[in-house]
């Protein structure tokens, strides 16, 4: 996981707990990579820019200059009582977009704007911000490896939207449900409400798509309500504790290595085995081999048994005479592995973009955004549609830090259109190099283009703090500060 750090030239380096995200150090990545602001009690605005560069890995520059607008556009409706903004997805990106709009609409400098001497908007603009999410709250995805192995920590990682002080504003409402379709021409979305099980039409003036990727367990919990999530965690923790024949983690990507080392840290007497089909861990990531090798070394040193170059071709359960269940795994070389519990961290993440029109997507289902985070110009009303986070096709490893940075851009640019549809002053993204931080037990292995591969407990403290980046993200978004108009 890794997190976002920003330095003004607008060079935002994102290193959130990778899990990117990816994560998981402000790997605001997933699967294990995230990017987050540095751990410090000093307000980020008062810190020297040098401290930002130290931990930021994604140079994304914010440019205050006009950007050519896509041709396929219709000016947003002007004198309406208030602008209607629909945000699809309430994770890192979605919440940052909502908070940015909330600040700007009330004539405040956005909380994510670290420009020196930044000026507030010239006037307030009434808005109604609707956030639609399948879950009933914000889940700290970066913390999944620990949350699914610790009931105490799990309780901290999921906060119902109704319990987040910063979002308790009349201008913001949350709908637990899913968006089934979006008509960009008419600006109407179809929303299936989880509570009523009814589909309703939602008209909007601006849309920000931040629904991310569909990921399986154990990358993310499958529960949609906090109470169900805690029950899901309890079940997994019980299985780990009672696995007399050890625990096997399948898949050596970011999620797999973080889960394996976290289990070893939390349950030091438990036998933990990590199986990966390739000869190197993190084989799917665009990272140097010295980073992959360093991760493998740390994993082994933690006490995890590492099996590389072997694929699990079959799994079967065996019932013992005492009623105990044992897993039998067969590898490609014919070797048999037995375990009391198996966690499969091999799953292909799929974009949750089925609700968007085909002309807005590439062949893999991602939105090929412009540097302004807007939809491609072939889409009707493209300038009023934005995509951020994992759903967007953009450079760099996907992580939460990048999603938060993109959210600030999308919300700011939407606000610019509200201020002046004819001459908006967009801020734009720049391509960024690969960056990742992995929380491996009490240590972390990180990679940035400027510092290369690093590891150690100090790196863990810098990228993840003491709670897998939870406090870093929570405080960065200022979620605990009650909203004041």
Residue ranges and their predicted role:
Residues 72, 81, 177, 397-402, ...:
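C-terminal, flexible cofactor-proximal segment of oxidoreductases
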Residues 243-271:
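Rossmann-like NAD(P)H-binding beta-loop-alpha module
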Residues 226-244, 336-405:
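FAD-site-proximal beta/loop scaffold in flavoenzymes
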Residues 67-175, 261-287:
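Beta1-alpha1 glycine-rich phosphate/pyrophosphate-binding loop at the start
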Residues 44, 50-59, 65-86, 168-248:
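FAD-binding core/adjacent interface of flavoenzyme oxidoreductases
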Residues 170, 174-177, 181-182, 269-371, ...:
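A Rossmann-like FAD-binding core segment of flavoenzymes
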Residues 122-155, 209-239, 447-448:
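Glycine-rich active-site loop/strand segments that organize a redox cofactor
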Residues 1-84, 106-126, 322, 482-485:
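Eukaryotic N-terminal targeting leaders
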């Amino acid at each position: 996981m890794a997190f976002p750090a920003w330095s003004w030239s607008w060079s935002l380096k994102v290193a959130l707990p990778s899990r990117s995200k990816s994560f998981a150090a402000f790997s605001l990545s997933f699967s294990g990579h995230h990017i987050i602001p540095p751990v410090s009690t000093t307000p980020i605005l008062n810190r020297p820019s040098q401290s930002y560069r130290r931990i930021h890995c994604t140079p994304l520059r914010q440019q205050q200059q006009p950007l050519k607008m896509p041709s396929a556009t219709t000016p947003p409706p002007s004198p309406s009582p208030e602008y209607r903004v629909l945000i699809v997805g309430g994770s890192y990106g979605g919440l940052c977009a909502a908070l940015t709009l909330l600040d700007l609409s009330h004539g405040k400098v956005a909380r994510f704007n670290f420009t020196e001497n930044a000026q507030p908007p010239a006037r307030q603009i009434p808005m109604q911000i609707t956030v639609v999410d399948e879950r009933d709250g914000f889940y700290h995805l970066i913390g999944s490896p620990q949350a699914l192995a610790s009931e105490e920590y799990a309780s901290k990682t999921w906060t119902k939207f109704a319990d987040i002080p910063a979002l308790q504003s009349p201008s913001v409402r949350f709908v637990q449900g899913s968006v089934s379709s979006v008509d960009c021409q008419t600006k109407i979305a179809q929303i299936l409400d989880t509570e009523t099980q009814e589909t309703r039409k939602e008209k909007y003036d601006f849309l920000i798509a931040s629904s991310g990727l569909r990921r399986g367990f154990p990358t993310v919990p499958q529960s949609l309500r906090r109470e169900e999530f805690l029950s899901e965690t309890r079940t997994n923790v019980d299985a780990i504790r009672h696995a007399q024949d050890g625990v096997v983690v399948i898949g050596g990507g970011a999620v797999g290595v973080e889960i394996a080392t976290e289990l070893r840290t939390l349950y030091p007497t438990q036998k933990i085995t990590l199986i990966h089909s390739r000869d190197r861990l993190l084989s799917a990531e665009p990272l140097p081999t010295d980073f992959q090798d360093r991760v493998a070394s740390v994993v082994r040193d933690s006490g995890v048994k590492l099996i590389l170059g072997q694929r699990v071709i079959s799994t079967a359960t065996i019932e013992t005479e005492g009623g105990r269940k044992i897993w039998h795994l067969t590898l490609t070389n014919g070797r048999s592995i037995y375990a009391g519990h198996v966690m499969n961290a091999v799953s292909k993440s799929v974009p949750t973009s089925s609700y968007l029109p085909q002309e807005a997507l590439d062949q893999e289902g991602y939105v090929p955004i412009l540097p302004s985070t807007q939809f491609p110009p072939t889409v009707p009303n493209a300038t009023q549609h934005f995509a951020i986070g994992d759903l967007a096709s953009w450079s760099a490893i996907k992580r939460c830090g990048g999603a938060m940075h993109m959210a600030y851009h999308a919300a700011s640019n939407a606000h610019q259109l509200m201020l002046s549809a004819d001459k908006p002053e967009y801020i734009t993204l720049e391509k960024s190099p690969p960056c990742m931080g992995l929380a491996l037990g009490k240590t972390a292995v990180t990679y940035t283009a400027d510092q290369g591969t690093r590891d150690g407990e100090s790196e863990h403290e810098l990228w993840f703090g003491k709670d897998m980046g939870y406090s870093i993200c929570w405080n960065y978004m200022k979620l605990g500060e009650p909203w004041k108009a």
